[in-house]
Amino acid sequence: MKGSDVKVAPVIAIVICFAFVSLGDIVSLKTKAKFPSLAVAIVAYLIAIWCGMPKTYPDVSGLAALGDILFPVFVAGLATSILPISIVKNWKFIIIGCIAVLAGFLCTVVVGGLFYDPREMFAAAMTTCGSGLTGGLIVLDRLKGTGLTEMVTIPLLLACTIDAIGQPVGSLITRKYAGKLIASDAYLTDKIVDHSDGGKLNKWGAPFNSSENPSPRFCAWIPPKYETEAVAFLQLIVVTALAMWLGGITGLGWSIVLILLGFGGTFIGLFRMNMLDRTQTGGFVMAAIYALLFQMLNDMTLQEIMAKIVPLLLVILLSGVGLVLGG
């Protein structure tokens, strides 16, 4: 009987999947995130299956299926992680970020398209310039939905490893702009404004423009005593379902609609900040998403990865150059 065909108990499968996730977390903490958790977990999983470990663990555990379902909920949680007032105060950051992303995207598609399939470069650029793992999984979902499964290799590899590359670039751009802010005393000015706005309270006693009432104008809809973990999770699931429906009838796709609904819901008082954290399920949701990636990687061989090394490095190089120049 082949190792990949071995039947395993769901509980054992869950233990194995969580072991890889935990290993990634431990190594990331030990190395101060020099080796990101996801990259470590992915490398460990690939080595294990190439050495004969059964590939059935993500499926038998049920985590991969949950990851597929919960990933949009994770995106909904991300959409509630920014204070509306921060968007206004940090408009320079946003403009610089948009220019950098556009430059990186165009550099990857235009220059990379001269050497490889432009469609493949487009999908890769959406991953490197579209918020890493989150953008990569959205791209993979769209590729599979349109039947372009032959183009998933590079976006999948990038989704698993891009944080290890993107974090230093993001840090460079942030330090570059932060230096200008400090030099112009803009940072201190923002701090003074923050303190002067802190006295206005909503009817529940929480300050406006705070994590408990992110909206600058509207009171939180749900009284704090009723926003339990289950209620917070229900809010995320409802807005996710609404985004799926609206994305289908408008053609915009669920991800764009979900981000807009998340931002809008935060502004009008429907959501508080960091809704996924309030459900106390963030760790489990991420473990399920990791298992989903494990499942996607099951059929990937070392030879296939080596064959994509050159275009993979080209995408990372072009995206990095574009992001730095644009920022």
Whereabouts are the PLM-identified features?
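Transmembrane helix-loop junctions in multipass membrane proteins, especially transporters and channels
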Residues: 29, 33, 54, 109, ...
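Short alpha-helical transmembrane interface motifs in multi-pass membrane proteins
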Residues: 8-9, 55-60, 89-93, 120-122, ...
